[in-house]
Design a protein with these regions (language model features):
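N-terminal sensory and localization modules of signal-transduction and trafficking proteins
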Residues: 1-6
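Juxtamembrane extracytoplasmic/periplasmic/luminal helical "stalk" adjacent to the first N-terminal
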Residues: 8-85
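Extracellular/periplasmic ligand-binding regions of membrane signal-transduction receptors
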Residues: 63-97, 120-132
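Short, hydrophobic-rich beta-strand element in sensory/regulatory alpha-beta domains
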Residues: 69, 112-117, 214-217
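Solvent-exposed, extracytoplasmic
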Residues: 98-107, 131, 184, 191-233, ...
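Extracytoplasmic/periplasmic ligand-binding sensor regions of membrane-associated signaling proteins
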Residues: 106-113, 120-196, 257
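PAS/PAC or PAS-like capping segment
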Residues: 180, 198-199, 283-284
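Extracellular/periplasmic juxtamembrane segments that couple receptor/chemosensory ectodomains to their
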Residues: 222, 230-290
C-alpha cells in the first residue's frame, strides 16, 4: 500500500511545483509587461520635455532672424534705394549706408553668416561689400528666392542646405527669406535672405542624449531633413529613416521594429516653423536600464 501512496505524493508534489512555477512565470510576465509599459510611458514623457525645450530654442533663433528681416525691410534707406525713389547721383551713397547698416545688424550675432538683398532693380547688397557673389543672374533660380516670391510678404524658413551664392563659400545654413515690399502699397521690390549657421542647430540638438543609442532629429514639413546625426549616410542611401511615418504623425509616438531592434519614435511639430522634432529611443535599452 505504500507504493500507491508514494505515487500520489509524487504527483501532488509535481503538480504543486508546476503550479508554483506557472504562477511565478505568469507573475514574471505580468511584472515585465507592466515594467515595460511604465518605462515606455516615462520615456515618452521625458523625450517630449526634451523636444519641447529644443523646439523653444530653435523658435527663439527663428524669431531673432524674423526680427532682423523686419528691421531691414522697414528701413527707410532700404525702401528708397530698392524702389528707385532716389536720384541716380545718390545711389552710391545709399549703397554704402545700407551695407554699413547690414554690417551693424550682422555684427550683433555671430550665428548670422549672411544678409543679402536682391532688388528687382538689379541691385544686390550684402552686409560685406567685399563679398564676391557667384552670379547675380542665378539668384532668382535659388529655391529660397522662389519660395519668398510665392509667399509674398511672409517669411519662409528653409531646411538645412549649402548656400552657394558667395564665391568660394559653401556653408551649411538655415535660410530665412522674404520679399522687400512697400509698406503702403504692398508691392514687392526684391527678396532678402538671412542665413543662420547650421552649426547652431547641430550643436543644439546633438548635445541631447537619449541613452547610449537613442538620438534626436528634425524634419521639415516637406520631408527634407533639417538635422540628423546620420544625415550624410541617409543622403548617400546607406541608411534609412522613417520619414514618411514621421510626416504622418504630427504629434505623439509610434513604435517600429526592424533589424536594428524595437524603437519608440516620439514626434512633436512646431507651430512656429512646421518642423517635426523626433526623439528615438531603443526599447531594449530602456528596459535593461530599468
Amino acid at each position: 500500500m505504500k507504493q500507491p501512496s508514494r505515487k500520489i505524493q509524487t504527483t501532488i508534489a509535481l503538480a504543486f511545483a508546476a503550479l508554483v512555477f506557472g504562477t511565478a512565470l505568469v507573475m514574471a510576465i505580468i511584472s515585465y509587461t507592466f515594467t515595460r509599459e511604465a518605462v515606455e510611458e516615462n520615456s515618452r514623457a521625458y523625450t517630449e520635455q526634451l523636444i519641447d525645450q529644443v523646439q523653444a530654442n530653435i523658435d527663439s533663433y527663428v524669431d531673432h532672424m524674423e526680427n532682423v528681416a523686419e528691421v531691414v525691410q522697414l528701413n527707410d534707406q532700404v525702401q528708397r534705394f530698392f524702389t528707385n525713389t532716389i536720384p541716380p547721383e545718390d545711389r552710391e551713397l545709399y549703397r554704402g549706408r545700407i551695407s554699413a547698416f547690414l554690417t551693424s545688424i550682422a555684427g550683433t550675432r555671430s550665428d548670422i553668416s549672411l544678409i543679402l538683398i536682391a532688388g528687382d532693380n538689379g541691385e544686390v547688397l550684402t552686409q560685406d561689400p567685399g563679398l564676391e557673389l557667384r552670379s547675380v543672374a542665378e539668384i532668382p533660380n535659388q529655391r529660397w528666392y522662389q519660395r519668398a516670391r510665392e509667399e509674398s510678404g511672409n517669411t519662409v524658413i528653409s531646411s538645412s542646405h549649402v548656400q552657394n551664392v558667395v564665391e568660394g563659400e559653401y556653408r551649411w545654413v538655415i535660410t530665412l527669406s522674404r520679399t522687400i515690399n512697400d509698406p503702403l502699397t504692398g508691392i514687392d521690390h526684391g527678396v532678402m535672405l538671412v542665413d543662420l549657421n547650421f552649426s547652431v542647430i547641430s550643436q543644439l540638438v546633438s548635445r541631447i542624449s537619449l541613452g547610449d543609442k537613442g538620438y534626436l532629429f528634425i524634419v521639415a514639413s516637406d520631408g527634407s531633413i533639417v538635422y540628423h546625426p546620420r544625415q550624410e549616410l541617409i543622403y548617400s542611401d546607406l541608411e534609412r529613416e522613417y520619414i514618411d511615418r514621421v510626416l504622418e504623425q504630427r504629434d505623439g509616438s509610434f513604435v517600429v521594429s526592424d533589424e536594428k531592434g524595437e524603437r519608440i519614435y516620439t514626434v512633436s511639430t512646431s507651430n512656429r516653423t512646421g518642423w517635426r522634432t523626433v526623439g528615438v529611443n531603443y526599447v531594449g535599452e530602456l528596459v535593461k536600464n530599468r
